């Protein structure tokens, strides 16, 4: 049996895209024979799944489950929206959500580990990368959730009130995507950034104006920014005549927290250059 050196593990990892520990195990099983290790990994479908792991998965689905006092919000990504609509993917998401809820998981790491075999099987079958990206669990007196087309999900925790109110506020969160619960959470740095952006965008309008007028303009913009960014100060989407905070207060409730997920949020999607791809294929064919 050949010695399982770090260099050998590194070579197998570079050739297959698999993780270090998986490569080490494969080499140990193959008696240090790297070619046999690769064949074994190919036969198990591991390499196919590992290679797909490098592909950007920015589509997918948001899933949520709640029992009125707790909820789990989950995002699972796929490479294409087409796969996200298929039963195999939907079943994977549903099973992952059920496991996370039943085990009261508070983050994605243990779920990713326990669902890895199922994920690899799905990747091998569908030919796309699939990732469990993130998970949040919340608990409280009253918990409501809203899911919009499996692409946007929101969860709201209330102290007082009822599930229907929490669900309606979650619907508002899904529609408005507030940044903060209330204006007291907005940092001085965020306000300063907003002020600087306002000054840059309105340089021509404020040029030559008295300092007190400029200050009033800035204060007006900051007040508007706080109202737009804060959940409690936003106009309720189902009744713009009332603010969300006032809605909760009238119902004898207090909004404790909210969580918002949108599929692919923050993931940089690759831009396909079809012309360049065709040109590359033509050039390769001429060689």
Swiss-Prot record:
MF annotations from Gene Ontology: translation elongation factor activity
What keywords does the record list, in alphabetical order?
Cytoplasm, Elongation factor, Protein biosynthesis
Q: Region labeled Involved in Mg(2+) ion dislocation from EF-Tu — which residues?
A: 80-83
Location(s), subcellular: Cytoplasm
Q: Which InterPro entries match?
A: EF-Ts_dimer_sf (IPR036402), Transl_elong_EFTs/EF1B (IPR001816), Transl_elong_EFTs/EF1B_dimer (IPR014039), Transl_elong_Ts_CS (IPR018101), UBA-like_sf (IPR009060)
- Please give the GO cellular component terms listed in this UniProt entry: cytoplasm
- Entry's family note: Belongs to the EF-Ts family.
Its biological purpose: Associates with the EF-Tu.GDP complex and induces the exchange of GDP to GTP. It remains bound to the aminoacyl-tRNA.EF-Tu.GTP complex up to the GTP hydrolysis stage on the ribosome.
Name of this chain's protein:
Elongation factor Ts
Organism of origin: Pseudomonas putida (strain ATCC 47054 / DSM 6125 / CFBP 8728 / NCIMB 11950 / KT2440)
